[in-house]
Every structure is written in structure tokens, then in C-alpha cells.
Amino acid sequence: MAALAVLHGVVRRPLLRGLLQEVRCLGRSYASKPTLNDVVIVSATRTPIGSFLGSLASQPATKLGTIAIQGAIEKAGIPKEEVKEVYMGNVIQGGEGQAPTRQATLGAGLPIATPCTTVNKVCASGMKAIMMASQSLMCGHQDVMVAGGMESMSNVPYVMSRGATPYGGVKLEDLIVKDGLTDVYNKIHMGNCAENTAKKLSISREEQDKYAIGSYTRSKEAWDAGKFANEITPITISVKGKPDVVVKEDEEYKRVDFSKVPKLKTVFQKENGTVTAANASTLNDGAAAVVLMTAEAAQRLKVKPLARIAAFADAAVDPIDFPLAPAYAVPKVLKYAGLKKEDIAMWEVNEAFSVVVLANIKMLEIDPQKVNVHGGAVSLGHPIGMSGARIVVHLAHALKQGEFGLASICNGGGGASAVLIEKL
């Protein structure tokens, strides 16, 4: 009867207040208090990035994920039993077996009872995994989580359609192209979308080549100066009949001949094209992971945070304009955090193509000297499920105390994700 009275608006005020309090409590069923929890990164690591069919080709994505998860937990200095849940980004899952994140998690020795989820937001997958884990921690659903991304493009299979074999034989399709690098709406390669952006914003081949050479140069300088040392978890590879091989450095940035860059033919648009194999990112293997927890959990476990998650956002545009999508995610993040672009000490804009970074620098009107200061995917490599997590990992180590860093990555289908962190 009381419920009926509420529906008709005649219930007495004390009873109404009681019912509303119950509803408010139910609405906070995932939180122990009415405010959101602060979320911190207590460790951040990644594997070296292997070239396509290169040093890491023997390692499936799930194994790379295992190594990153293990490395993150070891660097955090916490028991594996403290990790309540794991999210990992992974894009091209064909042939990997069921539940790739579950495989990576159990391979890392976490308890059987640890829930696991694989996230696929194309190139933004690793970053989206971090964002989703942060949301779970903010609302109090969990207090310690691992998140990141993994990809082995060297191990992606070819497929053929099911059904009767047609006259003339069957056609094999490369899942790297079909599931990773093709705009399904316009039936064109991601590189053609990049060409569209170059034309729309009047970004020349010469500008893109210059940017790519700069990326390779900055990556080499950063490696020589030890800028990546703290974020790397080495990989030991067993070779039958030979000594183990330890991979502890990125492979891709060394594979460049600057004299050939301006001479390369364009790949996606033969006439008046601008995108080449040199000024685009490459196909690669690798994984990255962070240990995230609430500030209260960090105090309980007596661990020193690297950084805090300050804000994050997604954005979406026309699929063909996916290279521009970060320019729509970034303002959302700055608005949520109450910051201006001048407050950002370091920017990471994923280098899917050189034109992506040039376009977003132009649209956001940000200082190029603060963008990808240690190189990016053009020179380091772009394992697509890993890259969004990798740029967050790098900011967590590269920033100085009190500085803000903003990482953003575009993804196929017209999307982008962005994460703002503050170094602690």
C-alpha cells in the first residue's frame, strides 16, 4: 500500500524520505562512500617491441601478456592474490584460443578465481582497458586491478570463408588487414583514411617524412639516454639447442635508412599520395600492463604510487576521419580535469601514421616540442592492442613529479580514447 501511495503522490514525507534513502543506498551498491575513489598507478611496464616476424615472433600474444602482467605485479611489489581482476586489450584474436586475457592472467600465476576480460577497441584497446579498470576502482567495485594490452601481429593467421569450395579454388584473407586495418564502412585501408586526412588538412608528404625521421631520431636518442630503461620487462626466449636469447630493447627503431625515406613509393594512393612505409607505423609484437589501485589500497599495501589517473574520455567521428578523433577526446579530458592545454607537460599522441600526429597538433594547437618527445609508433612499432597502454606506461615514467601528461590514441571506426595522468 505504501508503494501505491508513493505512485499517487500521497505518501507522508517521513516515509518518502526513508524510501529515497533506501534507493540512494541501492544506487551506491558498488561504492563504500558517496564520492569516487582516487585511482593510482603503482607500477607500469611493457615488453620490448618486436619487429614483424622478428625477435618476438615465437611468442603468442597471450604469452607476451603474461610477461607484462608478471612484470607489472613484480614491480608493484604486491602479492598476486591482491589483484582482484584483470582487463587486457587485444585486437586480432583469431587463432589465439578462448579468452586471451584469461590465458595471460593464469599464465602469470594469478589465482584461478581472478576474473578476466578482453577488451577490443581496435588500436585504443589497451588504453580502454586501463580506463575501464579505473572506472571499476573509482566506484569501489574492486580495489586492485591489472590492465593493459597485448598483440602478436606476427602470429595472426590467414582465414578462408566457410562453405562449399568454389570453382577455381579458395581465397585466403589476412586477418591483420581484415580485422585490424580495414575501414569496414568505406571498404578502404586505414592508410587511405590517413591520405584523406592529409588532403583535408593540407599536410604534405615532405612534412610527414620529416616527422617520421624525427620520430626515429628521438627514439634512438631516448634509448641511448636510458629513457625507456625503467619501463621495460625483458623477455627470455628459449631456442632449441642454443643458449637462451634475452630481448630487452625495441627492435624497430634501428631498422631505418634515412636516405631512402624521401625516395619510397606511396603505399595506399599511387597518384599524389603522401603515406609511405617510412612515415606510417609498422606491424609489431608486444604487451604492456599497469597495476592500478585505489589510494586507500595503496596505503594499506604500503606501496608508493607512480601517478594518479586524473581524467579520461572517448570520442567518435566519421569512420574515415578516425585520425582526427583524438582532437575531440582531448578537450573532453581537459574539461573534466579543469585544466588548459598549457598545463600539460608531455603529450603522447599515438603515431599510427605521421599524419595523425601532425593533424592533431594542428587541430589542438599544441606545442610540437611537447609531443612524443621520445618517439612513437612510427619508429618504436605499433602492436595494435598494446599501443594505447604503452603510451600511458611511458608517461608514468617520463613525467616529473607534479607534472600532467596526456595520452591519446585514435582507433578504426572513427574513435579515440584519451587518458590524463599526474605524476606523484
Swiss-Prot record:
CoA binds at Y216, R255, V256, D257, K260, S281. The modification N6-acetyllysine is found at K63, K171, K178, K187, K199, K220, K227, K242, K248, K254, K260, K270, K335. Succinylation at Lys-265, adjacent to a coenzyme A binding site. Desuccinylated by SIRT5. This is one of the enzymes that catalyzes the last step of the mitochondrial beta-oxidation pathway, an aerobic process breaking down fatty acids into acetyl-CoA. Using free coenzyme A/CoA, catalyzes the thiolytic cleavage of medium- to long-chain 3-oxoacyl-CoAs into acetyl-CoA and a fatty acyl-CoA shortened by two carbon atoms. The activity of the enzyme is reversible and it can also catalyze the condensation of two acetyl-CoA molecules into acetoacetyl-CoA. Thereby, it plays a major role in ketone body metabolism. It comes from the Eukaryota. It is found in: Mitochondrion. Keywords: Acetylation, Acyltransferase, Fatty acid metabolism, Lipid metabolism, Metal-binding, Mitochondrion, Phosphoprotein, Potassium, Transferase, Transit peptide. Belongs to the thiolase-like superfamily. Thiolase family. One of its GO terms (molecular function) is coenzyme A binding. GO terms for cellular component: endoplasmic reticulum; mitochondrial matrix; mitochondrion. It is an enzyme of class 2 (transferase). The active site is at C123 (acyl-thioester intermediate), C410 (proton donor/acceptor). The record marks H382 as: Increases nucleophilicity of active site Cys. Gene3D superfamilies: 3.40.47.10. This is Acetyl-CoA acetyltransferase, mitochondrial. Activated by potassium ions, but not sodium ions. It catalyses: 2 acetyl-CoA = acetoacetyl-CoA + CoA; propanoyl-CoA + acetyl-CoA = 2-methyl-3-oxobutanoyl-CoA + CoA. It comes from Rattus norvegicus (Rat). Pfam families: Thiolase_C, Thiolase_N. Pathway: Lipid metabolism; fatty acid beta-oxidation. The modification N6-succinyllysine is found at K63, K75, K171, K178, K187, K199, K220, K227, K240, K242, K260, K263, K265. NCBIfam families: AcCoA-C-Actrans. The keyword Protein biosynthesis does not apply. Homotetramer. The modification Phosphoserine is found at S204. GO terms for biological process: acetyl-CoA biosynthetic process; acetyl-CoA catabolic process; adipose tissue development; coenzyme A biosynthetic process; coenzyme A metabolic process; fatty acid beta-oxidation; isoleucine catabolic process; ketone body catabolic process. The gene is Acat1.
